[in-house]
Swiss-Prot record:
Name of the protein described by the UniProt record: DNA polymerase IV
Complex formation: Monomer.
Residues under site feature: Substrate discrimination: F17
Cited Gene3D superfamilies: 3.30.70.270, 3.40.1170.60, 5' to 3' exonuclease, C-terminal subdomain, DNA polymerase, Y-family, little finger domain
Entries under InterPro entries matching the protein: DNA/RNA_pol_sf, DNA_pol_Y-fam_lit_finger_sf, DNA_pol_Y-fam_little_finger, DNA_polymerase-Y, DNApol_IV, IMS_HHH_1, Rev_trsase/Diguanyl_cyclase, UmuC
Function: Poorly processive, error-prone DNA polymerase involved in untargeted mutagenesis. Copies undamaged DNA at stalled replication forks, which arise in vivo from mismatched or misaligned primer ends. These misaligned primers can be extended by PolIV. Exhibits no 3'-5' exonuclease (proofreading) activity. May be involved in translesional synthesis, in conjunction with the beta clamp from PolIII.
Organism: Moorella thermoacetica (strain ATCC 39073 / JCM 9320)
This protein's UniProt keywords: Cytoplasm, DNA damage, DNA repair, DNA replication, DNA-binding, DNA-directed DNA polymerase, Magnesium, Metal-binding, Mutator protein, Nucleotidyltransferase, Transferase
Cellular location(s): Cytoplasm
Requisite cofactors: Mg(2+)
Active site annotation, chain numbering: E110
E.C. no: 2.7.7.7
Amino acid sequence: MVSSDCSILLCDANSFFASVHQALDPGLRGRPVIVAGREATRHGIVLAASYEAKLGYGIKTGMTVREARGLCPHGVFIPPRHDLYIEFSTRILRIMRDFTPLVEPFSIDEAWLDVRGCRDLHGSPLTVARRLKQRIREEVGITTSVGLGPSKLLAKMAAEMQKPDGLTVLDYADVPGKMWPLPVRELFGIGPRMEAHLAKLGIHTIGELAGFPVEVLIKRFGVVGRILHQCARGIDYSPVDPHSLDTVKSIGHQITLPRDYRGYEEIEVVLLELAELVARRVRLGGYLGRTVAISLKDPEFHWLGRSRTLPHYTDTAGDIYAAARHLLHRHWPEWRAVRLVGVSLAGLVPATVRQEDLFGRVERQARLDRACDQLKNRYGERVIHRAVSLTGAGVLYGGS
């Protein structure tokens, strides 16, 4: 293939949750930090771990606290602080946007940047990558792995090749030597289920996928087969889209709980916290929505998703929570344990369609929401929140 300008970056914050705590407490640097549920409960699970814990002790996300403590008895176990993770993610995105407006967040700890138009102002893409890593390290206190490539796919693959604190370039000419020997599961977008399907076809490496007859892949997987074949060859035409969230059909958030939650009372606390977070994101985006959905997963990974459409558009936590609570009570037995909770609002429209009610309730609530948003924008997410978040069931503000 023709050589290209590797001007697409994927910046990935290393071991993000654990790194946030190490950034806040320098005494934790170099120590095995494990973000998990309360140590006292046998149902607590590991949500994240520092590289010291991963590489030195074999700690993995999803294992129980009991297992992690057995492998790493002297590890530093810390309860999750999702409000801090959101705050640090926002700070990192601000630094990225100092280099280019073309920033597309992919998750809370990684984003793509297109820096092809920044050469005169900031230098070559490699120079931008080095400066970006330096600023995030100095201003936020977190190391990052950055991949550079001619496409989002190759930038993502490059970022995965050197962790932590890596800087890797992956051009089209590098694909046969660097990508093709890798297991097919390491190709961006391939999960365990697709890996199993490909194994039945005798495909175990990315190179084998790249050399497999595309006609057979299309016959077996439809249009996905063609996309898989292209990705294995490093081909990806999708642009970095800073407005990718502008066309979203829903806004939501989900949390893996630090332990098994049992009973409606505990789960409702999490639903309320998520409703507050989703409502704030909806308002920041300038939307209203009508359809509230919840997702629940038990410790055996059985999943439930249900939704309810409201008679009116909303951006308030109260409306979202009431609908989510109704869905919980209607579709989830109280005795059944919960490990993951998600809440979303769909049917989004511009907030200009808001209608006033006869008694001004909507406008009064809107003024209150705006005041709370302004406080959080200025002082951080923890400046004001529900008191119930400080109970043992709270997850966003350190209650657990």
